[in-house]
């Protein structure tokens, strides 16, 4: 109750002076303390906001880089797969060429062997014919005790060969 009595005991002039002094003190505090304090708080809020915005931009940039890296990785894998497939195809093609060349060479060697065998057979038959003809002439000469002329010999050989061919 002391405060109420004191307030009522104050004269109006003192009360008016105290109110004006209080308002003046509030105005000075607003200019001196509140203004710089709000300025510091606003600057701090702006810095926090810009840091958040910067972090968001950095996050978006990181996501963008990550997606680029993923795309590059996929492209690299695709290129590597293509290189491997191309190498396999090239190796298969080269293998086919080597096999084809070997088959051609084998066919050529086989054909040459057949040709050589045929020639040897013909030479053997021809040699055998000549030997048989000479033997036949010798036997016939001995049997006949005379020597055949060249024409008679040839006729006898031809007859003997045709007789052999029919058998």
Curated annotation (Swiss-Prot):
GO terms for molecular function: proton-transporting ATP synthase activity, rotational mechanism; proton-transporting ATPase activity, rotational mechanism. The chain crosses the membrane at residues 9-29. One of its GO terms (cellular component) is plasma membrane. Keywords: ATP synthesis, Cell membrane, CF(0), Hydrogen ion transport, Ion transport, Membrane, Transmembrane, Transmembrane helix, Transport. It holds the Pfam family ATP-synt_B. It is found in: Cell membrane. Signal peptide: none annotated. It is a single-pass membrane protein. InterPro entries: ATP_synth_b/b'su_bac/chlpt, ATP_synth_F0_bsu_bac, ATP_synthase_B_chain. Belongs to the ATPase B chain family. F-type ATPases have 2 components, F(1) - the catalytic core - and F(0) - the membrane proton channel. F(1) has five subunits: alpha(3), beta(3), gamma(1), delta(1), epsilon(1). F(0) has three main subunits: a(1), b(2) and c(10-14). The alpha and beta chains form an alternating ring which encloses part of the gamma chain. F(1) is attached to F(0) by a central stalk formed by the gamma and epsilon chains, while a peripheral stalk is formed by the delta and b chains. F(1)F(0) ATP synthase produces ATP from ADP in the presence of a proton or sodium gradient. F-type ATPases consist of two structural domains, F(1) containing the extramembraneous catalytic core and F(0) containing the membrane proton channel, linked together by a central stalk and a peripheral stalk. During catalysis, ATP synthesis in the catalytic domain of F(1) is coupled via a rotary mechanism of the central stalk subunits to proton translocation. NCBIfam families: ATP_synt_b. This is ATP synthase subunit b. The lineage of its organism: Bacteria, Bacillati, Bacillota, Bacilli, Lactobacillales.
